[in-house]
Amino acid sequence: CYQRAYEMESTWDWAKLGGFLDTLNNHFAEVENVLDIDRTLWMMAFENLTVCLDGPINSIPHNFYLFKDNNGRFSPLLWDMNMAFGTFTNGLPTPVLIADLQELDIFHNSTDASNKLTTQVFSSDRYKRMYVAHMRTILNEQFANNNYSARASALQQLIDTDANADPNTFYSYTEFTSNINSSVGS
């Protein structure tokens, strides 16, 4: 039954996925045995701060991977970050204003019963405190001092030639060069 809701990118070991989901849903006190909870909290904090709603914190929890780490636990892997900074707003009331994105609740979707990962994680006061601490760290080490902006500019310069030559882009080259400091697209 999992094959309708999940895509397996490696071996077809549905039993391990089923065990993980059973623990998440029915034995949450044991979740740290099957999930790298700290890495999950970092991912959720990063997605909230960058308003990347095309992942587990949205009401449509998809577009992220889980892989088995060296400790035998599932660990999240970000994917589809091109939807960050509010470019994917499904699940938010319409119309979505810039202020809505800037003031997104730090516990966005924490009570949405259809999103088990988020509701389960945020049901723990300890995990909530860790999550807020991770948000604070990201804010202090990347946003408050503009490290993220400098890094974005460096990455933009690194891929500039390839982006200009790419015939399959979603946006024009002019939009590519201006999108660090302005909204691009709808």
Model-derived regions, located:
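Internal "kinase-insert"/substrate-recognition segments embedded within catalytic cores
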Residues: 1-50
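Mixed-charge, polar/low-complexity N-terminal
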Residues: 30-32, 36-37, 47, 55-56, ...
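C-terminal catalytic region of ATP-dependent kinase domains
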Residues: 5-11, 67-186
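Active-site acidic catalytic loop and adjacent metal/ATP-binding pocket
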Residues: 33-87
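Sec/Tat-exported extracytoplasmic proteins
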Residues: 21-28, 48, 52-53, 135, ...
